[in-house]
C-alpha cells in the first residue's frame, strides 16, 4: 500500500479538514484565525494575471526544431550552422483581438510565435499567419487595436469603428484582403502558415548583412473555414482549435512546419516600387524565393497551461548573435512594447519563469525586484570590477556596425507608401472562388456599417481594382459610379 499523500497549505503544513471553516461553535461566525481558509481564499483572489492586451486567447506546445540546411552563408547564429542541429522550442498560437475565452472561430489574424532555446540564449520568432499588418508605424498600433476592440461604452465590438479606421488608413487595404478571405478563419492551428511579417537582418561571420523574412509552412497544408463552416462549428464548440492541437499531440499525430527564409541584398532595397521594410507589404515567393531552413515538430503538450502557455513571453527583439532588427517602423515599436507588457502582466522577473528561462547560462547584475526566485548570490553586483571570477563583457559579441539610411531625423512620412499595389497583387493572385469569398465576407460584415464608411472603403477598393469595388458595391446596394468619378 502506497503512502498517503497529505493535502497541505502552501507552508507545507498538513490540512486536517478541507470541508469546513473554523467557527465559534456550530452556529457562530467564522474565525479569522483559520489560516487554511484565509490562505486558500487569498490565493484564489490572485490566481489570474492581466490577460494580454492582444493575443489573449492562445494554445501552445513544446517541440523541437531541426536545421535541415546550413544558413552559415547568411548568419552566424549557431543553431543554424550545421544540418541536423536540434533546438528545443515552445510554440504559441493565438487569436489577436478577442479575449481569453472567446470563440476560436471568430475572424481574426492568428498569432504564430516560437521560442527557440538555443545554446547561445533564447531567440523569439514572433509572427502571424497573415504575411502583412494593418499599419506601417508603431505609433498607430494602439489606434488600430482600439478600433478592433469592443466599444469602451458598450463593451461590444462594432464594425463601424474598425471600418471607419480602415477607410482612413489606406495602408490597411492589403491586410483587409487577407483577413476577410477565408484565411481569416483557419480550420485549426495545425493548418496555419506563419510569417515574420517584418524583415530582419542576418549577419554572417564575414560581417555581410542581408535582409530576411521567415515563413512557416504547415506539412498538413493550409486549411481554412468558410463563414458558414465557422458558424456551424461555433454553434457546437468554441475551443475547436485548442482542442484539435491538444488531441493531435496526445494521439501522437505531431504537427510539423517547414521553416523557409527569403533573402534580400541591401543593395537591392531601393529596386522596388515599394519599401520592402514596410510591414504592410508582402514579399511574394516568385520575387523572393523560399529557401528551406529546417522543420519544427510539436510533440508535447503543456503540463500546466497557466505556467506555460499563459506565462510565456515573446519579443521580436529577443535575437541571438547573427541576427538584428531591421528599420521597419512597426517592428521598432514592438521591440519595446512586447517585453514591457510582460513586465506589467507577469512581473519584472518574468524571464526567471521556467517557460521563459534560457537553457544558456545567465550571468549579470540584474537583481531583486518582485518575486525573484533565481537569485544570483555574488556580492559583486556592478561592472566594471576587478574580480576575475565575475562576469565581464565580451567584445566578440558586439553587434556589427550597420549603415544608417538617411540623415534627417523627425516625423517623416514613409517613402513609397504604394498603399494599393500589393492589394492589387493579392486580388490578381486569388482564384475566382477566393475572390467570391472575400467579397461575400466583406458584404456580410458591412450589414450594420454606416453608408459613408462603406463609401470611403469602396473608394480604397476601387484603387485596388474596379472589379473588386464594383462587386462589393453590388452586394451592398451602393451605386459605385456616383462616388469614384474623381478617381478615374
From Swiss-Prot:
GO CC terms of this entry: cytoplasm
Reactions catalysed, as given in the entry: 2 H2O2 = O2 + 2 H2O
Signal peptide (from-to): none
Cofactor list: heme
Binding positions for heme per the UniProt entry: 338
Compositional bias ranges of the Polar residues kind: 7-23
Region (Disordered): 1-26
Enzyme class: oxidoreductase
Annotated localization: Cytoplasm
Family of this protein: Belongs to the catalase family.
Identification of the protein by name: Catalase
Species of origin: Listeria monocytogenes serovar 1/2a (strain ATCC BAA-679 / EGD-e)
Organism placement in taxonomy: Bacteria, Bacillati, Bacillota, Bacilli, Bacillales
